């Protein structure tokens, strides 16, 4: 069964959700993200997706204290993104307890640097963030667009051993309108050696079941979980031995 990965987006140390990546649309769900993380862990979740939205805008991680608390108080494997654009920032994220680091803008602006990281670290610890708006990869906290498509960006790093990609359909992010299942199935088919993680638009377990039928291996769920459309019991159904 496809793995569900809860999303925890952080602004000012609090757990929030945005719509279309618009910072002005934020809604706070937990003042202490650790509370959410503990609930997910209790439900049997293994991975947590954490995005430092302050860091994405500032071009450097800004909520490492939140990461440190969750890493220290839970056994969750945290994948952390937002503002990781230097080797120092990457090390700080790992030192704070992240199991994996998500890199997007740096892979577009400094592909040689990201390729070097794939060579230096276990490629399984680095996730390429290939988030798309109108077919183009968006960068800098989704505030700018590049000239690359997701397949073009992913293809650059296959020779370096890339194994994991998170692809968010920004047009559907926070909209609870269902994912672009055909798009993701095509992307997974093009890159069979890479785990393509779906993100954006998930509204129900039916959406997730369709992605599972299409051969996707993991999916990030945010607003549907916080709004109660998908429950903790639903999460438990997707555990490996459920």
List the predicted regions and their residue ranges.
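Catalytic cores of alpha/beta
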Residues: 74, 78-100, 182-218
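Charged helix-capping and loop-helix junction motifs
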Residues: 61-68, 143-152, 177-185
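Glycine-rich, proline-tolerant flexible connector loops at the mouths of alpha/beta enzymes
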Residues: 47-65, 105, 167-177
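Glycine/small-residue-rich loop that forms an oxyanion/phosphate-binding "nest" at active or ligand-binding sites
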Residues: 54, 60-121
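Conserved, mostly hydrophobic/aromatic
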Residues: 9, 40, 48, 93, ...
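Conserved anion-binding
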Residues: 12-25, 91, 98-173
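Glycine-rich phosphate-binding active-site loops on the catalytic face of alpha/beta enzymes
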Residues: 92-113, 169-172, 200-207, 214-234
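Conserved beta-strand positions in the central sheet of alpha/beta enzyme cores
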Residues: 49-52, 79, 102-103, 127, ...
């Amino acid at each position: 069964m496809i793995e569900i990965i809860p999303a925890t987006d952080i602004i000012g140390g609090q757990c929030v959700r945005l719509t279309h990546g618009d910072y002005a649309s934020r809604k706070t769900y937990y003042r202490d993200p650790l509370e959410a993380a503990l609930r997910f862990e209790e439900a049997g979740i293994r991975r947590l997706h954490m995005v430092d939205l302050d860091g994405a805008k500032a071009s450097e991680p800004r909520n490492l204290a939140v990461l440190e608390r969750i890493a220290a108080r839970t056994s969750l494997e945290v994948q952390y993104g937002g503002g990781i654009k230097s080797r120092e920032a990457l090390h700080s994220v790992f030192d704070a307890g992240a199991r994996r680091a998500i890199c997007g803008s740096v892979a577009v602006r400094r592909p040689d640097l990201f390729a070097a990281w794939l060579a230096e670290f276990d490629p399984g610890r680095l996730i390429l963030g290939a988030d798309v708006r109108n077919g183009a990869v968006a960068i800098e906290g989704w505030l700018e667009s590049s000239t690359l498509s997701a397949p073009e960006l992913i293809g650059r790093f296959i020779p370096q051993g890339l194994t994991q990609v998170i692809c968010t359909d920004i047009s559907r992010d926070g909209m609870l309108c269902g994912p672009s299942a055909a798009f993701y199935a095509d992307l997974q088919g093009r890159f069979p050696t890479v785990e393509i993680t779906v993100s954006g638009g998930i509204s129900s377990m039916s959406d997730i079941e369709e992605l599972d039928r299409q051969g996707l291996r993991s999916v990030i769920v945010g607003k549907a979980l916080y709004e109660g459309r998908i429950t903790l019991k639903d999460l438990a159904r997707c555990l490996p031995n459920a």
